[in-house]
């Protein structure tokens, strides 16, 4: 009788349209229930039966109901699933497979089967890549995934590397393309093999891509020649290898090993500026005035050089600081080091006055055993030899930025616009609260930004600096010239690492066009998109492998009295994120470890402070001693608490 009844259909439609709905992101918990975090900062309870239809991170719409005076939501439609492609561990029971995603809030195993073209015999504990195929909110009975790639066994010591690379869909090995033929075309090379060029790198570096030579002009000024390895002499634009390099965009440096952008034969041998080997280079010659200013005589040219010494950062630094056993092999090399040191001090002083100099932060290097175990973590402070190379490279990149801008009007530029205009008023308000007067329009100029940064660097603590950084925009890659506020420079275009950066290869080709007087095409914007995306993925991969190795390294320190000095890098709703200064690990201190009474404690991300009973106890940038409370290897989570 009620079948196909138009009145009933109309009533259903009215009820449907009157039912209130909310859109938001599902947040899972360990307890079976969940919450829907709506875009307006409000969250709604999702009871356990309804949580079975969704997954943590899903963006959904849900209907809103009231049950026992409490608002609850019932998931209705899926807008965007949290899981599409993911990595996880296999479970096998009675020949049926399921996979648990490698995510701290996804504990449920998802039924799965191997894709038709995947022939691996999956076993319990194996790691695999999977793609979601079914979802309850799409009308399916349950979740279901398809295994698209086998990664490795559960007990492989190199799990952190292989799983991370698979998670981010990054290559696991060097390109396998043979190329040894050189194509110089109309490029004429100057013979500079008699000059005392030197390379300065880490002792273990094989892909040396920059060599330096300095000459004293006798009037207080110096003439610097920067010679850069020339892979574009072997890699033609549009060739198979060029397309591979463009796709990879960068050499991927992970703890323990790297995955090169170019074949190792090129990166570590044919192009590498090895000592006493003749190599083709792209070079730049420029005068550095006594006060460190760059001359207007910038000259780019092609050349052949022969590096006379492969120097290591620590050896050069020790020698300049009059310590250690190491000595340069002869007086010519010693003179080069002295001149480079003089150049470094002049350029550093000029940049401190007229541009901006980054504060030195140490690097942390993992020392790994044969099976990927962490033997130690070494703190590598930036020393004078690192600064020599840094100042020379920055000078070289400013030269390229000027020449490409003036001759072509385009290139691959690193651009940073300082403050985000949308946040500038907030930045001014925060500065005002801390007694620093600033004008919004002035802060949006390069000079205004530099003046503020110098003022912040002179502050006794990092607190205000860390508050203000939240309002800055991100650095970008652009095909048109623009300022780099972070460096305090009018323009910046890198060309000094073409073995490991595709953008630098593009700039090499453009500089060669300037040298030979040939026409050059403006790079496509999709190149900059790929560079930005790959930089993001490579950084995430480095962080993920690091998190895994830190968890392994600190596992046996959990529950002991070993103290670590730590710096607060962030205040979150639930506690503090701190960096252990001895080894670089980022760990979490839950607020309950700081003060037991939740209502008396306020964690303010906005203010960067943690207060107890209204008194500020910790601020971002503060240091404190901590001990490791717990290490969860399966999620790579490290929990610490303040040392008593």
Swiss-Prot record:
It is an enzyme of class 3 (hydrolase). It catalyses: Exonucleolytic cleavage in the 3'- to 5'-direction to yield nucleoside 5'-phosphates. Its main location: cytoplasm. SMART domains: CSP, RNB. GO terms for cellular component: cytosol. Transmembrane segments: none annotated. It is found in: Cytoplasm. It comes from the Bacteria. Gene3D superfamilies: 2.40.50.640, Nucleic acid-binding proteins (2.40.50.140). GO terms for molecular function: exoribonuclease II activity; RNA binding. HAMAP family: RNase_II. This is Exoribonuclease 2. The gene is rnb.
């Amino acid at each position: 009788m009620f079948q196909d009844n138009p009145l009933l259909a109309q009533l259903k439609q009215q009820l449907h349209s009157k039912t209130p709905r909310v859109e938001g992101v599902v947040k899972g918990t360990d307890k079976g229930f969940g919450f829907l975090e709506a875009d307006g900062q409000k969250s709604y309870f999702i009871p356990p039966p309804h949580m079975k239809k969704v997954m943590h991170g899903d963006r959904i719409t849900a209907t809103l109901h009231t049950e026992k005076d409490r608002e609850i939501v019932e998931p209705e439609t899926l807008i965007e699933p949290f899981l599409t492609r993911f990595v996880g561990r296999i479970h096998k029971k009675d020949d049926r497979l399921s996979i648990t995603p490698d995510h701290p809030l996804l504990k449920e195993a998802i039924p799965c089967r191997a894709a038709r073209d995947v022939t691996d015999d999956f076993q319990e504990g194996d790691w695999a890549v999977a793609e979601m195929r079914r979802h309850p909110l799409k009308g399916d009975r349950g979740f279901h995934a398809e295994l698209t790639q086998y990664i490795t066994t559960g007990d492989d010591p190199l799990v952190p590397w292989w799983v991370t690379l698979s998670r981010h869909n990054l290559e696991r090995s060097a390109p396998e393309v043979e190329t040894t033929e050189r194509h110089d075309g109309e490029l004429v090379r100057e013979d500079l093999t008699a000059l005392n060029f030197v390379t300065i790198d880490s002792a273990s570096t094989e892909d040396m891509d920059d060599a330096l030579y300095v000459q004293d002009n006798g009037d207080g000024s110096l003439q610097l020649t920067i010679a850069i390895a020339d892979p574009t002499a072997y890699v033609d634009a549009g060739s198979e290898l060029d397309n591979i390099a463009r796709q990879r965009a960068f050499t991927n440096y992970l703890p323990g090993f790297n995955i090169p952008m170019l074949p190792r034969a090129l990166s570590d041998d044919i192009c590498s500026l090895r000592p006493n080997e003749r190599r083709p280079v792209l070079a730049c010659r420029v005068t550095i005035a006594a006060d460190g200013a760059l001359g207007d005589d910038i000259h780019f040219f092609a050349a052949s050089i022969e590096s006379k010494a492969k120097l290591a950062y620590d050896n050069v630094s020790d020698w300049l600081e009059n310590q250690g056993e190491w000595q340069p092999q002869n007086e010519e090399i010693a003179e080069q080091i002295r001149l480079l040191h003089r150049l470094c001090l002049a350029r550093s002083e000029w940049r401190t006055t007229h541009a901006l100099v980054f504060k030195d932060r140490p690097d942390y290097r993992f020392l790994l055993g044969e099976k990927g175990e962490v033997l130690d973590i070494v703190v590598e402070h930036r020393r004078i030899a690192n600064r020599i190379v840094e100042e020379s490279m920055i000078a070289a990149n400013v030269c390229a930025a000027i020449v490409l801008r003036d001759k072509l009007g385009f290139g691959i530029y690193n651009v940073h616009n300082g403050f985000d205009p949308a946040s500038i008023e907030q930045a001014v308000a925060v500065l005002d609260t801390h007694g620093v007067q600033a004008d919004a329009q002035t802060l949006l100029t390069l000079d205004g930004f530099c003046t503020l940064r110098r003022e912040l660097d002179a502050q006794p603590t990092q607190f205000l600096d860390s508050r203000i950084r939240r309002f800055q925009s991100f650095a970008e890659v652009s095909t048109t010239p623009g300022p780099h506020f972070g460096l305090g420079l009018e323009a910046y275009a890198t060309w000094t690492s073409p073995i490991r950066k595709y953008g630098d290869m593009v700039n090499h080709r453009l500089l060669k066009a300037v040298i030979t007087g040939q026409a050059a095409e403006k790079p496509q914007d999709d190149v900059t998109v790929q560079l930005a995306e790959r930089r993001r993925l490579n950084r995430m991969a480095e962080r993920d492998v690091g998190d895994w190795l830190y968890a392994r390294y600190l596992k046996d320190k959990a529950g002991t009295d070993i103290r670590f000095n730590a710096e607060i890098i962030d205040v979150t709703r639930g506690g503090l994120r701190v960096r252990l200064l001895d080894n670089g690990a980022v760990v979490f201190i839950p607020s309950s470890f700081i003060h037991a009474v939740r209502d008396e404690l306020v964690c303010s991300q906005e203010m960067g402070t943690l207060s107890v009973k209204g008194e500020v106890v910790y601020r971002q940038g503060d240091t404190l001693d901590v001990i490791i409370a717990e290490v969860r290897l399966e999620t790579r989570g490290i929990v610490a608490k303040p040392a008593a």
